[in-house]
């Protein structure tokens, strides 16, 4: 089937009142960026929906990219038809013959935005329903949940026919909720947290702590690859590598073993908050899931969070591990996340970390550190890399060249 346009429905944007125009403009920008590989496309966004004119581009290639753009409830590939009843009838019959298999039911859903057209919506439903039965006499009408829902829209310029409704990514357009710093480890949970934050409109920058030689180059690349998996949903991600070796060595030297993880996490949070301020972010996002590990009990969260007043978003905090894994598999981060490379949270992990650390003890042990100097040197050594679809493509080409 040769489609001529894709009709996009906004979903939650329809509830945004006075801010609606801003949300729609951001969505249009995000769609344009996601479909940048298709230069012939034209995008028209109005109050109720968006129309993507294909202009000869292949809908089969466009649809997978469009399905990852947050802010879209669903969309329908459509066929443009001359606004004359004989032409509309003929196309309806052609489409239903192509998609019908024995036992399927159908329904006609007509909408007439051009009120000068010869038939109203009810008239179109009746006329085109008759055309379907004429083409396939044995087909049955089903008004609720039909197998085939033929949608006809009569606009000023032409008539448009669609029969397929594809579920979108939902949520809000990325960029409408401000910027957040994602504490991206190499595990399963943090990429899922980033994905869920982006779904609510947050522009995410990834903060990753590296402690060479204790953590390897492969572990760092794994974190970058995880960030790359999130790129199709957002366009580009700034990957911020934080040198953490000196800090971890000093923590190990002066802090009792049971509090190593608590103090390590406090320093990570302090640094992430400092980076957030530098990068003009509003929130911190992490992959903490309540009581999953020692540093994620409520008592640990209290002892760690004390270092900042910045809001911390924990999208997976109440999820079971199986629920998190299900999303990780959906966004294709799971197999990558389970690769066995050490990260900063595991290299000096004590055999018996405190699950109920006391805040006063955490403050006492942290005071043994030269916080100002350690943080200043770490912040001076930040490495920021932009990860985009283009950089991912270049990496694939380099890997292929190495293989040859």
Swiss-Prot record:
Pathway: Cofactor biosynthesis; thiamine diphosphate biosynthesis. The gene is thiI. It catalyses: [ThiI sulfur-carrier protein]-S-sulfanyl-L-cysteine + a uridine in tRNA + 2 reduced [2Fe-2S]-[ferredoxin] + ATP + H(+) = [ThiI sulfur-carrier protein]-L-cysteine + a 4-thiouridine in tRNA + 2 oxidized [2Fe-2S]-[ferredoxin] + AMP + diphosphate; [ThiS sulfur-carrier protein]-C-terminal Gly-Gly-AMP + S-sulfanyl-L-cysteinyl-[cysteine desulfurase] + AH2 = [ThiS sulfur-carrier protein]-C-terminal-Gly-aminoethanethioate + L-cysteinyl-[cysteine desulfurase] + A + AMP + 2 H(+). It comes from the Bacteria. Belongs to the ThiI family. One of its GO terms (cellular component) is cytosol. Keywords: ATP-binding, Cytoplasm, Nucleotide-binding, RNA-binding, Thiamine biosynthesis, Transferase, tRNA-binding. It comes from Enterococcus faecalis (strain ATCC 700802 / V583). It is found in: Cytoplasm. Catalyzes the ATP-dependent transfer of a sulfur to tRNA to produce 4-thiouridine in position 8 of tRNAs, which functions as a near-UV photosensor. Also catalyzes the transfer of sulfur to the sulfur carrier protein ThiS, forming ThiS-thiocarboxylate. This is a step in the synthesis of thiazole, in the thiamine biosynthesis pathway. The sulfur is donated as persulfide by IscS. It holds the Pfam family ThiI. It is an enzyme of class 2 (transferase). GO terms for biological process: thiamine biosynthetic process; thiamine diphosphate biosynthetic process; thiazole biosynthetic process; tRNA 4-thiouridine biosynthesis. This is Probable tRNA sulfurtransferase. Residues 60-165 form the THUMP domain. Its EC number is 2.8.1.4. ATP binds at residues 183-184, 208-209, 265, 287, 296.
């Amino acid at each position: 089937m040769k489609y001529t346009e894709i009709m996009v429905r906004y979903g939650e944007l329809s509830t945004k009142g006075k801010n609606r125009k801003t949300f729609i403009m951001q969505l249009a920008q995000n769609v344009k960026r996601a479909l940048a590989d298709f230069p012939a496309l034209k995008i028209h966004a109005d109050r109720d929906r968006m129309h993507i004119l294909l202009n000869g581009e292949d809908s089969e290639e466009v649809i997978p990219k469009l399905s990852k753009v947050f802010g879209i409830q669903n969309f329908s590939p459509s066929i443009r038809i001359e606004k004359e009843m004989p032409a509309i009838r003929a196309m309806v019959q052609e489409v239903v013959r192509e998609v019908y298999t024995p036992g399927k039911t159908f329904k006609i859903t007509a909408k007439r935005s051009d009120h000068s057209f010869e038939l109203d919506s009810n008239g179109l439903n009746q006329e085109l329903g008759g055309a379907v039965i004429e083409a396939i006499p044995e087909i049955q009408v089903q008004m609720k949940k039909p197998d085939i829902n033929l949608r006809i829209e009569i606009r000023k310029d032409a008539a448009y026919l669609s029969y397929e409704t594809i579920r979108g990514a939902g949520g809000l357009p990325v960029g409408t909720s401000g910027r957040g710093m994602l504490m991206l480890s190499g595990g399963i949970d943090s990429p899922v947290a980033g994905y869920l934050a982006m779904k609510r409109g947050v522009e995410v920058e990834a903060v990753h702590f590296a402690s060479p030689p204790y953590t390897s180059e492969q572990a760092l690349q794994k974190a970058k690859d995880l960030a790359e998996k999130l790129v199709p949903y957002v366009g580009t991600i700034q990957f911020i590598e934080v040198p953490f070796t000196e800090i971890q060595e000093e923590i190990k030297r002066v802090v009792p073993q049971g509090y190593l993880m608590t103090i390590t996490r406090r320093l990570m949070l302090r640094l992430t908050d400092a980076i957030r301020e530098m990068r003009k972010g509003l929130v911190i996002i992490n992959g903490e899931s309540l009581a999953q590990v020692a540093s994620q009990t409520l008592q640990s969260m209290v002892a760690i969070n004390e270092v900042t007043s910045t809001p911390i978003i924990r999208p997976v905090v109440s999820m079971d591990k199986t629920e998190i894994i299900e999303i990780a598999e959906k966004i294709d981060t799971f197999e990558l996340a389970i690769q066995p490379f050490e990260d900063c949270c595991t290299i000096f992990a004590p055999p018996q970390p405190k699950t109920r650390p006391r805040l006063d003890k955490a403050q006492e042990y942290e005071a043994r550190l030269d916080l100002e100097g350690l943080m200043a040197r770490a912040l001076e050594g930040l490495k920021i890399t932009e990860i985009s679809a283009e950089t991912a493509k270049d990496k694939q080409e380099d890997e292929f060249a190495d293989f040859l």
